UniProtKB/Swiss-Prot annotation:
Residues 1-50 form a transit peptide. This is Large ribosomal subunit protein bL34m. It comes from the Eukaryota. It is found in: Mitochondrion. One of its GO terms (biological process) is translation. The modification Phosphoserine is found at S75. InterPro entries: Ribosomal_bL34.
Amino acid sequence: MAFSVGSVGCLLGPVSRSAGLLGGRWLQGSRAWLGLPDTRRLPVIQQTRGRTRGNEYQPSNIKRKNKHGWIRRLSTPNGVQVILRRMHKGRKSLSH
């Protein structure tokens, strides 16, 4: 099955003529020739995933009482000043 130069030119002849008639659009990779939508014009819907926010504060009653409680306030001189300052200001709640 040896092809001669004339038979190859005959095989490529209609392709080159259709390319000339179509303006070379088949070389641009247009998907319209395959019956598929052109994906370059469709909007890209992409889900953005970042770090979750809003869950930084996880309250602990034990830590709250240890840091700001009555026993802790009275155990240091500065804590006593905090209690006296709040009493002088008229606070109903002096500590946790």
